[in-house]
Amino acid sequence: MNAAIRVERLNKTFAGKQALFDLGLAIQPGEMVALIGASGSGKSTLLRHLAGLACCDRSAGGRIEVLGREVQATGRLHGEVRRLRADIGYIFQQFNLVTRLSVLDNVLLGFLGRMPRWRGSLGMFSDEQKRQAMAALERVGLAERAAQRASTLSGGQQQRVAIARALTQQAEVILADEPIASLDPESARKVMEILADINRQDGKTVVVTLHQVDYALRYCSRAVALKGGRIHYDGPSAALSDRLLNDLYGADLDASLLFSDRARNAEPRSLQLVNG
């Protein structure tokens, strides 16, 4: 089976300081993978490289493929990377919505990569596209808020709109960069359950960076832990140990994130969303 994501010898330097060191990684189609690690470990930097939003060092080589197509190599983006991005949904920590537009209009923007540019610039979306956008909002529990301005929603609701936009984009790979970092626990749970449902029901490959290790354990079968720009652990989330987490996070580790047996055996709850 061809990997959905393949990273080979990836290096990245910022202002003379190396952030990623010779990374190699393969993620299979349909996996849900958590990238974990302390702040500054390189997990968000890695995710941006997967989407072609940042380039690796030219001198040290490095290559990234997504869905069997080259994203970048030796510090240069592939000439067709814009087309490839139509198959990569990127969910930002700060939502990246157009807040003056309605919720529905924001979700419709997911279609832009698969329609003529002139139609998109004029907002000429078909009735079928509008139906699909409403179905995506229904799936994330926000159909009744379709006509509201995005600026009126809570942070958790805005993040769910961003996920609905990725659904209309018909992305095969979803990359989520700290999608729950600024959310309250209930909103975070809803967002993670939606991502897990998309992975489970649609077979989409999902890679999510998380600072909250307990969510990685509950929702992601595989964890890749970064420390100082290097992969420190790559394996089942269930095998993460308190000792490893202490090594990763040190004094920054909240004691509540050290797992009890009960937490380790917890299963994600079924997706039951209501508006709000």
Curated annotation (Swiss-Prot):
Highest taxon of the lineage: Bacteria
Entries under SMART domains matching the protein: AAA (SM00382)
UniProt subcellular location: Cell inner membrane
Catalytic activity as recorded in UniProt: phosphonate(out) + ATP + H2O = phosphonate(in) + ADP + phosphate + H(+)
Short name of one Pfam family: ABC_tran
Nucleotide-binding as UniProt keyword: yes
Binding site residues for ATP: G37, A38, S39, G40, S41, G42, K43, S44
SUPFAM superfamilies referenced in this protein's UniProt entry, alphabetically: P-loop containing nucleoside triphosphate hydrolases
Keywords: ATP-binding, Cell inner membrane, Cell membrane, Membrane, Nucleotide-binding, Phosphonate transport, Translocase, Transport
Membrane topology: Peripheral membrane protein
One cellular-component annotation, GO: plasma membrane
Enzyme Commission (EC) number: 7.3.2.2
Function description: Part of the ABC transporter complex PhnCDE involved in phosphonates import. Responsible for energy coupling to the transport system.
Family: Belongs to the ABC transporter superfamily. Phosphonates importer (TC 3.A.1.9.1) family.
Oligomer status and interactors: The complex is composed of two ATP-binding proteins (PhnC), two transmembrane proteins (PhnE) and a solute-binding protein (PhnD).
Protein's name in the database: Phosphonates import ATP-binding protein PhnC
Organism of this sequence: Stutzerimonas stutzeri
